[in-house]
Curated annotation (Swiss-Prot):
<dbReference type="GO" id="GO:0009507">
    <property type="term" value="C:chloroplast"/>
</dbReference>
<keyword id="KW-0150">Chloroplast</keyword>
<comment type="function">
    <text>Usually encoded in the trnK tRNA gene intron. Probably assists in splicing its own and other chloroplast group II introns.</text>
</comment>
<dbReference type="GO" id="GO:0008033">
    <property type="term" value="P:tRNA processing"/>
</dbReference>
<dbReference type="GO" id="GO:0003723">
    <property type="term" value="F:RNA binding"/>
</dbReference>
<dbReference type="GO" id="GO:0006397">
    <property type="term" value="P:mRNA processing"/>
</dbReference>
<comment type="similarity">
    <text>Belongs to the intron maturase 2 family. MatK subfamily.</text>
</comment>
<protein>
    <recommendedName>
        <fullName>Maturase K</fullName>
    </recommendedName>
</protein>
<dbReference type="InterPro" id="IPR002866">
    <property type="entry name" value="Maturase_MatK"/>
</dbReference>
<dbReference type="InterPro" id="IPR024942">
    <property type="entry name" value="Maturase_MatK_N"/>
</dbReference>
<dbReference type="GO" id="GO:0008380">
    <property type="term" value="P:RNA splicing"/>
</dbReference>
<keyword id="KW-0507">mRNA processing</keyword>
<dbReference type="Pfam" id="PF01348">
    <property type="entry name" value="Intron_maturas2"/>
</dbReference>
<keyword id="KW-0694">RNA-binding</keyword>
<keyword id="KW-0934">Plastid</keyword>
<keyword id="KW-0819">tRNA processing</keyword>
<dbReference type="Pfam" id="PF01824">
    <property type="entry name" value="MatK_N"/>
</dbReference>
Amino acid sequence: MVKLEVYLEKQKFRQQYFVYPLLFQEYIYAFAHDHGLNGSEPVEILGRNNNKFSSVLVKRLIIRMYQQNFGINSVNHPNQNRLLDHNNYFYSQFYSHILSEGFAIVVEIPFSLRVLSCPEEKEIPKFQNLRSIHSLFPFLEDQFLHLHYISHIEIPYPIHLEIVVQLLQCRIQDVASLHLLRFFLNYYSNWNSLIISMKLIFLLKKENKRLFRFLYNSYVSECEFFFFFLRKQSSCLRLTSYGTFLERIHFYRKKEHFWVMYPGFFRKTLWVFMDPLMHYVRYQGKAILASKGTPLLMKKWKCYLANFWQYYFHFWIQPRRIQQKPLANSCFDFLGYLSSVTRNPLVVRNQMLENAFLIDTRIKKLDTIVPAISLIGSLSKAQFCTGSGHPISKPIWTDLSDWDILDRFGRICRNIFHYYSGSSKKQTLYRIKYILRLSCARTLARKHKSTVRTFMQRLGSVFLEEFFTEEEQVLSLIFTKTIPFSFHGSHSKRIWYLDIIRINDLVNYS
């Protein structure tokens, strides 16, 4: 515990930031609005309407903030707060959205300053390619082939919202900002009469995405902060024994009793915790913990993580959230890919003087394939096909021009091929291309009240070129053809791109 306190003291901010006065500046809300329009937020397949920005309404909001001391009222009298309440539903929604977006922008400033002030800032540009999602897969190819067991963890949430505020209190010493955060949480819970935290989290995630991402990332950052500290300390467990490991879970409440009952227990050495080859990867609210150790070691880590969430976050994690599997005989869903470690046979010819030998061996390989069922299910939800994969027209797009329809379908197809370029089997991708191509043809035919055959004959090669992917364009320069056509099976090699910074819409579509 002493080591943990020292470690926490080193990680605290050395300066006290007062970000609350920035909420009374109009440019903060304009910046938040512009950031929402120009940010990397994915555009939904069915489209969405951006919230309009009004400087007049922002000025009215700032005046109301000056007139009401809502920071104190939100704690003492949460039901008597009228800052965001308005007879007009639009005004109430606008005040709520723009204030939460501005608050998220302001409260991120201390965390941004912390990153910029790190001594390794000169080395950051060298690793910009690591922002790509695909950069994780070469890491898995290099490391997972030598590991034995894997734990698939669903990071538990929501925890109690007051705990989230307390977590931020350790990082931000601005009391007024923390009161404002409590005000937001009380406002949403009272406005919708919600008692279950899961519904409140869903509401924040839907209507105030930036604020939700900030709260969720703060919570996950705190989890990883302690996990990495304990992971570093686990290398010392060979000297301190499993008994001390158990006592850390229960915060040393039984240490003296243990010492009296079993005086020689703490001098034992248990080698099972010595595991230098443990790797951790987090994505989409999930995490993968892979190890070269024994099943007993993975079970102990599972128990430890469950106790960690229970005692530190007061949250009971269901056992199903941590699934343990042997890496050799199982597959796992990772960033839209269905990944597994396979053993491929390899015949090696060994020539020794006059004799030749054929040696059969097996090599491990990380196999990444496209999950056909889930991807077709996403296309079905987006109304490109039926549940069985039969292409259908998209009536909502018939009001667009022919070029816009072709461009939308072609862009979706190219993005899917681009994201799944690392797949070792491309048959599923060609099936997806067929679905999108025929869905596009039926949409255009429905718009012009014609048949698919007639429309395809009229467009000809122009229609096919829209669904020509980047890889096929490179191959078309090498193998010239009069009519562009997809090269089935001609490029089975996996390609990992370094410009993919978010998961494809259809991969993460719900």
